[in-house]
Amino acid sequence: TAICDPSLTLGLPARLTAATGMDAVTHCIEALLSPAINPPAEAVGCDGIERAVGQGHLLKAVADGQDADARWNMMMAASEGAMAFSKGLGAVHSMSHACGADQSLRLHHGTLNAVILPTILDFNRDHVGDKYARLNSAMGNSKESDPADAIRTLNSDLGLPANLEEMGVKRDAIPDLAQHAARDICTFTNPRPASVEDYEDLYDKALSG
């Protein structure tokens, strides 16, 4: 059971608002891009993206934590993300789960998702049919926009790290992280198959942003 009361989030610090908000956005995006067929879940995910990003409620909530309307819409987007990912998640979560499993790093899951998301959007680009056009529409971008670059800009505007290196992930950890990510259940609903070697390359790219 989840109690989804946006008034409980009014005192959440800006950095945590940004990180948890991007966790919700990533849930919605990965659910949309999952190859599993579930049109209702896709529609719910698209609405969550539109609320958080297209309508600017994540940026508004970070700028003013007391903005009750922004908090309500972000709570709705988070709830929609949870409903949408019944369709499956993807390689962003596989990679963030692997990083989060290293307790010595003490890395925040939502921040990891935000930082890794652009790398996976680049990786999946040619394997999602027309879904990037739908994603751009929900985000309030032109159809020709690059959603990966849009997320990089959003992360910067939210004050989140630009890459995994800034979060303390070391290059010598890549082999173990890649093995963990390749075994993660979310890998199986990524629109593009990803091998251990793919994950090694993806971590290398995410380290530098």
Which residues fall in each region the model found?
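A glycine/threonine-rich phosphate-anchoring loop and its flanking beta-alpha core
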Residues: 1-37, 134
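Short, amphipathic C-terminal "tail helix"
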Residues: 171-209
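Glycine-rich phosphate/diphosphate-binding loops and the adjacent beta-loop-alpha structural elements
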Residues: 31-87, 97-101
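Short alpha-helical scaffolding segments that buttress acidic/His motifs in well-ordered protein cores
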Residues: 25-29, 74-82, 95, 117, ...
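Gly/Pro-rich interdomain helix-loop hinge
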Residues: 101-173
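Glycine-rich phosphate/pyrophosphate-binding beta-alpha loops
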Residues: 79-113, 184-189
